[in-house]
Amino acid sequence: PEAEKHLPQRQGYIVTGNPVRPEILAADRAAARARLGVRPGQLCLLSFGGSLGAQTINEAVAALMAWHVPEGKLHHIHATGRYGVELLPRLLREKGVAYENNPNLDIREYIHDMPDCLAAADLVIARAGAITLAELTAVGRASVLIPSPNVAENHQYHNAMVLANHKAAVVIEEKDLTGEKLVAAVKEMTADPEKLREIGLAAKALGVPNACGHITDELLDLYKTHRK
């Protein structure tokens, strides 16, 4: 609904939400966590910055891993993107992080099993594209959003602030992103599981899991109207 004020002012807009893949909605959390090696009761982080990767996000995630890996309390799935495949391991080596063969770290170039990863996650660190937010809200996941500044009219920032204004996410702008700020945000959110759950519930309240059905219904109504 917030997008309407940016559109030409005329009647006839219908808010449907963005379609979410059925696999995202149907993924089984317990099965996903078992398959991904998340221990019972262990908090799971999921982080990604797009298929190419983002240097600033990979740098901040390296600092995040340096913070949580020694304690071993968190399971962390991270997609480096194409340009982070060599960067992140180098940063982790420089920080002395034992990342190789670490059962609590799942570092890969790209996430091909997003339904399982989202189902397993308790907290997601991501950009703020429309489809990403549609998926996060549909499944009710708490998130730290880092909007890409390299988009038309800074729309990812506006997307992210919709969630932030409903206490459904924490937003860190890329110009303000540092390892210390990301660690502080994740540390605060994971320190209180009840607060993390509340953020997830606030996100879910914004979700439209049946957006595809809404779009189909509107198209059928339009077809029937013009067929007469």
What is the role of each PLM region?
Residues 195-209:
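A short, well-ordered alpha-helix in the C-terminal region of glycosyltransferases
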Residues 1-9, 132-133, 153-160:
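Short, glycine/polar-rich helix-capping loops at beta-to-alpha or helix-loop-helix junctions
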Residues 1-2, 17-18, 146-149, 172-176:
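Short beta->alpha connector loops at strand-helix junctions that form conserved
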Residues 31, 38-124, 157-161, 165, ...:
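Donor-nucleotide binding loops and adjacent catalytic segments primarily
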Residues 1-30:
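Active-site-proximal region of nucleotide-activated glycan assembly enzymes
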Residues 208-228:
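C-terminal alpha-helical cap of glycosyltransferases
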